[in-house]
C-alpha cells in the first residue's frame, strides 16, 4: 500500500501516437462504454458549468473594479492579478488545443480530439470566433458548448441515426467534456482557490472595520457573493471531473444525479471550513503564513508520495509534475489523483486539515478576540467540516457508484452464461441445417448473428 505506484486517473497519457484519442477510431472502441446514455442531468451539468464559470470570472473582475473605483489600488490589483493571470494561462492552453484541432482538420487526418468539425467534416465554429473567445477569456466555454451541443444531438437523434453516428456524437461529447473539465479543474485551483484567500482576507478585514458602524458598503455584499460563487465553482469542478472520468470508461459506473449532489455537498462544506481556516491564518500571521503553508506542503508531499505515487510508462517527468500538482491542490482540498482505494488517502489528508483547523480555532481568541462573531466562527467551522466528512462517509458507505458496479458485473456474468448455453444448444442444429441446405455461410457466422440476437433479447 505504501510507496506503491498507481495509474493516474486525472490525466490519460498515451504510450505512443497510436494510443492517442482519435475520436473516430480509438475512442469508439476503447474509451467509451458499451451502453451509451446521455441524461438530462448530463446536459444540466454542461449548462451549469458554463454559467458558474462565467459568473465566477466576471464577479472577480467586478470586485476588482469596485476596489479601484474606491481607491483601494492594492486590493484591486491583487484581485485582478489572481483573476487574469490564471485565466490567460487556461485560455492559452485552450487556444493551443483549438489550433491543434484546426491543423488536423486541414490535413484531413484523424485528430487527437474530435475537435472543430461535425459529422459531415465541417468546422464546428470558425477559427476566428475561437480566437475571439480566447481573447475574451471565455475559451473553456467553447468545449462546454460543444459537449452540450453533441449531447443534445445525441438525445435528439437517438431514434433516427445509426449506431455508428450515435457513437460519433457520444465520443465528440465526452471528448469535449474531458477537455472542458480538465481546463476547469486547473482553473479552479489556479484562480478560484487563491482568489478565495485574497478576497476572503480583504472582506474579513473590512467587515471588522465596518462592524462598529453597523453599516456596510455595497461592494462588501458583492464580494461575499463572489466568494460564494468561487466555493461553488471549486466544489463543482471536482465533482464534474470525477463524473467525466467515469462517463468515458467502460470499467467504471457512471455517477447518478443524487450521488453528484452528495459529492458536491461534501466538497462544499469541507472547502468552506478549509477556506475560513486559511483566511484566519492570513489574518493572524500576515505574510508569515508563507512558512506555515510551506510546512503544510512538506507534510502533504510526504503522505502523497507514500499513498498516491503515480506511475506513467516512460514519463518520469510527468509523474513528478503530477505529484507536485497534487501536493499544491492539497492546500485547499484533499484530492485522489490515482487509481486504488481512497480510504487511507482521505483519512490522512483530512486528519491533517482537522488538526490545522483545531489549532487555528484555539489560536483565534488570542489574536482575533475583537473580531465580530468570533465565538460563532469557532463553533461553525468545525461543524461545517464534520458535516462534510459525515456526508462523505455516507456517500462511500451507501451511494458510491462502485456499489452498483457489483450488480452490473453479476448481471453481465448471467448474460454470458445464457449466451454460452444458447450457443451450445444451437450449434449442432445449425451445422445439420447447413449440411442439408448447402449454403455458403459458415456455422460460425450464423452463431455470431444469433449471439447478437440473444444479447439483445436479454
UniProtKB/Swiss-Prot annotation:
One annotated Gene Ontology cellular component of this protein = plasma membrane
Question: Could you say what the effect of mutating residue 163 to A is?
Answer: No defect in apoptosis during embryogenesis
Q: Which residues lie on this side of the membrane: Extracellular?
A: 67-77, 145-219, 317, 375-378
Summary of the knockout phenotype = Delayed cell death process.
**Localization per Swiss-Prot or TrEMBL:** Cell membrane
Its function? Phospholipid scramblase that acts downstream of ced-9 and caspase ced-3 to promote phosphatidylserine exposure on apoptotic cell surface. Phosphatidylserine is a specific marker only present at the surface of apoptotic cells and acts as a specific signal for engulfment. Regulates apoptosis kinetics during embryonic development. Not required for engulfment of germ cell corpses.
Q: What positions are marked as the site Cleavage? A: 21-22
Give UniProt keywords alphabetically.
Apoptosis, Cell membrane, Membrane, Transmembrane, Transmembrane helix
Give any GO molecular function from the UniProt entry: phospholipid scramblase activity
Q: Which organism was this protein described from?
A: Caenorhabditis elegans
Which reactions appear under catalytic activity for this entry? a 1,2-diacyl-sn-glycero-3-phospho-L-serine(in) = a 1,2-diacyl-sn-glycero-3-phospho-L-serine(out)
Tell me the protein's name: Cell death abnormality protein 8
The organism's place on the tree of life at top rank = Eukaryota
Q: Which residues lie on this side of the membrane: Cytoplasmic?
A: 1-45, 99-123, 241-274, 339-353, 400-458
Please give the family membership noted in the entry: Belongs to the XK family.
Q: Does the keyword Cytoplasm apply?
A: no
What Gene Ontology terms for biological process does this UniProt record contain? apoptotic process involved in development; embryo development ending in birth or egg hatching; engulfment of apoptotic cell; execution phase of apoptosis; phosphatidylserine exposure on apoptotic cell surface; programmed cell death
Q: Give the stretches traversing the membrane.
A: 46-66, 78-98, 124-144, 220-240, 275-295, 296-316, 318-338, 354-374, 379-399
Membrane disposition:
Multi-pass membrane protein
Question: Can you summarize the PTM annotation of this record?
Answer: Cleavage by ced-3 activates ced-8 function in promoting phosphatidylserine exposure at the surface of apoptotic cells.
Amino acid at each position: 500500500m505504501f510507496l506503491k505506484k498507481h495509474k493516474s486517473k486525472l490525466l490519460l497519457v498515451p504510450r505512443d501516437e497510436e494510443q492517442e484519442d482519435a475520436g473516430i477510431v480509438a475512442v469508439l472502441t476503447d474509451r467509451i462504454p458499451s451502453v451509451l446514455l446521455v441524461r438530462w442531468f448530463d446536459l444540466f451539468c454542461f449548462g451549469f458549468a458554463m454559467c458558474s464559470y462565467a459568473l465566477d470570472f466576471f464577479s472577480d473582475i467586478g470586485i476588482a473594479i469596485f476596489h479601484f473605483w474606491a481607491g483601494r489600488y492594492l486590493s484591486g490589483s491583487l484581485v485582478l492579478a489572481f483573476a487574469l493571470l490564471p485565466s490567460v494561462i487556461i485560455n492559452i492552453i485552450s487556444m493551443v488545443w483549438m489550433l491543434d484541432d484546426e491543423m488536423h482538420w486541414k490535413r484531413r487526418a484523424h485528430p487527437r480530439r474530435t475537435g472543430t468539425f461535425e459529422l459531415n467534416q465541417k468546422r464546428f465554429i470558425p477559427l476566428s470566433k475561437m480566437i475571439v473567445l480566447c481573447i475574451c477569456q471565455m475559451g473553456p466555454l467553447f468545449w462546454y458548448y460543444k459537449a452540450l451541443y453533441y449531447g443534445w444531438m445525441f438525445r435528439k437523434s437517438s431514434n433516427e441515426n445509426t449506431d455508428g453516428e450515435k457513437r460519433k456524437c457520444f465520443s465528440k461529447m465526452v471528448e469535449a467534456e474531458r477537455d472542458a473539465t480538465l481546463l476547469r479543474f486547473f482553473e479552479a485551483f489556479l484562480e478560484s482557490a487563491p482568489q478565495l484567500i485574497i478576497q476572503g482576507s480583504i472582506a474579513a478585514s473590512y467587515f471588522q472595520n465596518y462592524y462598529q458602524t453597523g453599516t456596510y458598503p455595497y461592494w462588501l455584499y458583492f464580494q461575499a457573493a463572489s466568494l460564494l460563487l468561487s466555493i461553488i465553482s471549486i466544489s463543482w469542478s471536482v465533482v464534474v471531473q470525477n463524473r467525466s472520468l467515469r462517463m468515458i470508461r467502460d470499467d467504471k459506473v457512471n455517477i447518478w444525479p443524487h450521488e453528484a449532489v452528495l459529492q458536491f455537498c461534501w466538497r462544499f462544506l469541507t472547502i468552506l471550513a478549509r477556506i475560513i481556516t486559511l483566511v484566519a491564518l492570513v489574518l493572524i500571521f500576515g505574510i508569515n503564513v508563507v512558512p506555515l503553508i510551506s510546512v503544510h506542503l512538506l507534510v502533504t508531499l510526504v503522505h502523497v508520495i507514500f499513498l498516491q505515487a503515480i506511475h506513467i510508462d516512460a514519463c518520469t517527468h510527468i509523474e513528478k509534475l503530477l505529484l507536485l500538482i497534487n501536493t499544491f491542490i492539497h492546500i485547499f482540498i484533499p484530492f485522489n489523483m490515482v487509481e486504488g482505494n481512497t480510504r487511507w488517502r482521505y483519512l490522512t489528508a483530512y486528519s491533517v486539515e482537522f488538526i490545522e483547523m483545531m489549532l487555528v480555532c484555539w489560536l483565534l481568541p488570542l489574536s482575533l478576540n475583537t473580531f465580530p462573531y468570533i465565538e460563532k466562527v469557532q463553533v461553525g467551522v468545525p461543524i461545517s467540516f464534520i458535516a462534510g466528512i459525515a456526508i462523505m462517509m455516507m456517500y462511500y458507505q451507501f451511494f458510491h457508484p462502485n456499489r452498483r458496479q457489483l450488480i452490473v458485473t453479476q448481471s453481465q456474468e448471467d448474460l454470458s452464461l445464457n449466451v454460452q448455453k444458447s450457443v451450445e444448444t444451437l450449434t449442432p442444429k445449425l451445422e445439420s441445417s447447413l449440411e442439408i441446405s448447402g449454403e455458403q455461410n459458415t456455422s460460425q457466422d450464423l452463431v455470431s448473428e444469433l449471439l447478437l440476437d440473444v444479447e439483445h433479447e436479454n
